[in-house]
Amino acid sequence: MAINYGNADIVETIFNSLSETGYEGLLSKKNLMHILEAKDKNGFSGLFLAISRKDTNVVTSILNALPKLAATNHLDNEQVYKFLSAKNSTSSHVLYHVMANGDADMLKIVLNALPLLIRTCHLTKEQVLDLLKAKDFYGCPGLYLAMQNGHSDIVKVILEALPSLAQEINISASDIVDLLTTKSLARDTGLFMAMQRGHMNVINTMFNALPTLFNTFKFDKKNMKSLFLANNSNEYPGLFSAIQHKQQNVVETVYLALSDHARLFGFTAEDIMDFWQHKAPQKYSAFELAFELGHRVIAELILNTLNKMAESFGFTDNPRYIAEKNYMEALLKKASPHTVR
């Protein structure tokens, strides 16, 4: 009831009382977990209700008291993880709803509490990543919906939390890529959908974080290419989907981000040309797709950006660049769409 009515002081008092050494041995772990996970008549736990109702004071009180409570009563990481993984009656994770609905303030409270919980309760990397990948009953991740719906604040909170989490658990570059490219039931990634729908706030948030991700998690060129292309499960790039949907700002942002960060990522002239000549499963490049669909402005943008990068990176004499440049210019002289090669 205290949680239900938002009485943070009472909640804190109860949790702190359960943490007193006098309670140790009086309550079994099973009974303690029963108290912590007490549900209302609809099957919602107190933590689920507090988070769902955006009661930041109650949630903060619970999370602040949890490390001592777990230590006093010798709760193991699986029990703490189970408590944090509060679900509704349809087994949808509470953090799924937080991310899907764009409640960045609540997500930040939970993620800020994780480093201490990792240290004191020994949460594993797999458990922490599972919280970040919180899903609904059908297996759709909340982060995916946040990206699809343009909730850039959710993306920003997660990206900003990753370095501090990495200090506690061994999060690798591949773990981060896997998290950021998590897929829906339709096997599309959130970034793919953000590009398709033109959610510039999400895309800019992602690309602005790339230097930090690169330096913190030692990303390699392969990791970076995955994020720039944002492929779905059919290896169809989000960049190409953006072209199909005339999202010129998205296309420009992707190529500018590549231009801005290529040196940091150690991209060579060949790497840059690989990206420019990357083909969808249907065997056409981004430029060819734009031209075939009659999006001449986007096609010209792609050519102009390539020319600028060739000058900036000093590979204007590269045979691949010269051949591609000539091919693009020849196509653009044609009055009607050209069948892609």
Locate predicted features.
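Conserved ankyrin/ankyrin-like repeat signature
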Residues: 10, 58, 105-106, 153-154, ...
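Ankyrin repeat domain, specifically the short helix-to-loop turn at the C-terminus of the second helix
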Residues: 15-21, 26-34, 63-70, 75-82, ...
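Ankyrin repeat boundary/linker residues
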Residues: 39-40, 87-89, 135-136, 181-184, ...
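Non-Sec secretion/translocation targeting segments of pathogen effectors
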Residues: 333, 337-341
